[in-house]
């Protein structure tokens, strides 16, 4: 078997949601963003001390995760993992005991293949991945008191089905230990970006949606290395339907406090992670963070929104390519509303209480940044600087739950066949067809706000489309030509062109292409979610 190759397909067994962990998004700190492989016992202990002294622990940050390069390059004679004796002379259990003694929890990094990412790229010796050692390593983690496992794919090999089966082996091995361990996976590392292609909640507590983050606002990537904050948001917003207690989209460890962005952008970064129900895993050097960074990371209003017991990710209410409105229902009936300016100039962003799921005529708005309150009859509006985000907690009135983000098959009323990405081809410009419904990932569409996404790509109408233009999938980019409305008559209309999703020529056979056509509400333009 080639190094890094995975075999042995089988369906998932136990649900990750049954492990009792991560009922709200995990909060903590990870060593990688600031230190990479340059880690040791003293650094981790100093960082833990700083988390306590700064008030971060009391704000909810509890997991201290030691990333790649913590291990001895060789397993012991019995095949057990060992901490690197030079870097961690007291051993990994002693480190876990130290963290637990501080009221914190202990996280470690490992991979399901033969080599970690650092080993794959030759920056760290050995081949100490968990491939073939899953049960043994899970028992070792439990014996060391590990509370959080980051499990990074680190291989170009493997189909998405092989990834599911391989990640599930460690999920089940962790469950067999009887110790509640948050299970965090990254299917994207050194691999095609499969993170956004399925709901991984049957496999893990949290899963990465994109390629690795960097401390920049916009790198121009759609899902390639490195990803800026806005780029990650564009991918993660349409995945809202996947989030629930015990299972969360992970847009990556935070870059707040690491430079490369303005204070406004840092605040937006944290605010958007909060409303997206993302794990709040800090990545800065907490030993020397500024007062401004500490203030952002410990904002109690945003943390309360993030940690709300409903565990819902904010869904998109509206987006015009610049001004984005998201709404996150909260357990007590309040709604958190984010007004996010993706443009390069200050602009006013507006919505209404009704649009975000509230009923009534009188509401209180709590500004999550200033803690100021105001009242409104329904209008919610703010002047938002470039790359800024205003967040309000809307209380009062009643709550009408807006249509939740939905994931499922889109079935043509004319044929009973499903909207299908042929051969799971994710190349930009691939034209969907109808095909016998089979439950495949290439027939699962995530519908959130006004976007439709499959296999990590967005349903897209060509610019300046006219009747007969093909529908296609394309990298999600927030463009107006990727916005759709689902209508009461079952049609799906492209908001930019006004044309409807149409099965070409009203044909019903497998492989019939899907195009854009003048809306008629005929059976070949009507779709149901299943």
Where are these regions (language model features)?
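Secretory targeting and sorting signals
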Residues: 1-15
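Lectin-like carbohydrate-binding module/patch detector with strong preference for beta-trefoil
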Residues: 4, 399-530
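Aromatic-lined carbohydrate-binding/catalytic grooves of carbohydrate-active enzymes
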Residues: 47, 51-160
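Carbohydrate-binding surface patches
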Residues: 273-276, 281-283, 319-358
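C-terminal beta-strand-rich structural cap/linker in extracellular carbohydrate-active enzymes
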Residues: 376-399
């Amino acid at each position: 078997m080639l190094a890094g190759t995975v075999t042995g397909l089988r369906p998932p067994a136990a649900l990750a949601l049954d492990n009792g962990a991560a009922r709200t998004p995990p909060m903590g700190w990870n060593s990688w963003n600031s230190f990479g492989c340059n880690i040791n016992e003293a650094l981790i202990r100093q960082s833990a001390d700083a988390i306590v002294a700064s008030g971060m622990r009391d704000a909810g940050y509890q997991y201290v995760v030691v990333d790649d390069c913590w291990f001895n390059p060789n397993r012991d004679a019995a095949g057990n993992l060992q901490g690197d004796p030079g870097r961690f002379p007291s051993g990994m259990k002693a480190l876990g005991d130290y963290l637990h003694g501080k009221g914190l929890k202990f996280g470690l990094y490992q991979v399901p293949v033969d080599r970690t990412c650092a080993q794959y790229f030759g920056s760290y010796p050995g081949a100490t991945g968990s491939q073939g050692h899953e049960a043994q390593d899970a028992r070792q983690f439990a014996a060391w008191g590990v509370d959080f496992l980051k499990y990074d794919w680190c291989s170009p090999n493997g189909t998405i089905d092989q990834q599911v089966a391989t990640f599930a082996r460690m999920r089940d091995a962790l469950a067999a230990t009887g110790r509640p361990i948050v299970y965090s996976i990254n299917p994207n590392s050194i691999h095609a970006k499969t993170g956004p292609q399925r709901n991984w909640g049957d496999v893990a507590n949290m899963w990465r949606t994109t390629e690795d983050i960097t401390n920049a606002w916009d790198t121009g990537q759609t899902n390639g290395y490195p990803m800026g904050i806005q780029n990650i948001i564009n991918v993660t917003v349409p995945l809202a339907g996947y989030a629930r207690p015990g299972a969360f989209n992970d847009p990556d460890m935070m870059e707040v406090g690491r430079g490369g962005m303005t204070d406004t952008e840092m605040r937006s970064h944290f605010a958007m992670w909060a409303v997206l129900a993302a794990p709040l895993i800090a990545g800065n050097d907490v030993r020397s963070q500024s007062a401004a960074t500490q203030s952002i990371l410990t904002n109690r209003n945003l943390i309360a929104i993030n940690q709300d017991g409903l565990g819902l990710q904010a869904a998109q209410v509206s987006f015009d390519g610049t001004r984005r409105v998201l709404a996150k229902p909260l357990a007590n009936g309040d709604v958190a509303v984010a007004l996010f300016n993706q443009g390069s100039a200050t602009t006013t962003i507006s919505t209404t209480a009704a649009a975000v799921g509230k009923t009534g005529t009188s509401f209180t708005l709590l500004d999550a940044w200033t803690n100021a309150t105001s009242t409104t009859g329904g209008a919610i509006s703010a002047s938002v600087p470039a790359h800024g985000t205003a967040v309000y907690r809307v209380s009062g009135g009643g709550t009408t739950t807006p249509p939740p983000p939905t994931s499922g098959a889109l079935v043509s009323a004319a044929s009973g066949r499903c909207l299908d990405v042929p051969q799971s081809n994710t190349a930009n410009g691939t034209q969907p067809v109808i095909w016998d419904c089979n439950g495949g990932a290439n027939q699962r569409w995530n519908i959130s706000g006004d976007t439709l996404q499959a296999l990590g790509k967005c349903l897209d109408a060509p610019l300046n489309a006219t009747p007969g233009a093909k529908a296609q999938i394309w990298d999600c980019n927030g463009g107006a030509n990727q916005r759709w409305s689902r209508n009461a008559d079952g049609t799906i209309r492209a908001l930019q062109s006004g044309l409807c999703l149409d099965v070409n020529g009203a044909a019903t056979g497998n492989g019939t292409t899907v195009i854009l056509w003048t809306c008629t509400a005929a059976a070949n333009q009507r779709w149901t979610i299943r």
